[in-house]
Amino acid sequence: MSSFGHRAFFSCCPLLEGETLHSIKLRKEATYQTQSGWPVRWPIRYPRALPLESHVHPYHMIVKLPHPRTQPRLFLWLSLHWTGIPFLGKPGIGRNRVKSKQFSHFQQSKIKTTMRKKTTNRKQKAERCQYRLVTA
């Protein structure tokens, strides 16, 4: 079990979409239990509390848990590694290797918007350069 910064990677049984973890025991090893009853074990390395929008990945379901100790309003964001889900296929090695059809459209639209921004910036720069040349 390795952690990428604040992200915790789990090895667990397949989860249903929208399923949450509800039981938590804080010791050297934490045991989380899903609603369907699968136990999920994780050596604790307290991840930071993250905002809602951060780090959504097709092979990892972000799960919200209340902070176990002093701050009950804070949430720990834990990334659960999805194993055994047939429609996702085999997970890629890197974070950016997206093989899921579910997320491919989102990624393409994101790339298109960034490309558009770049082209408009190029046009503006070219116009500025021409204007400078004419006035100089």
Swiss-Prot record:
It comes from the Eukaryota. This is Uncharacterized protein YCR025C.
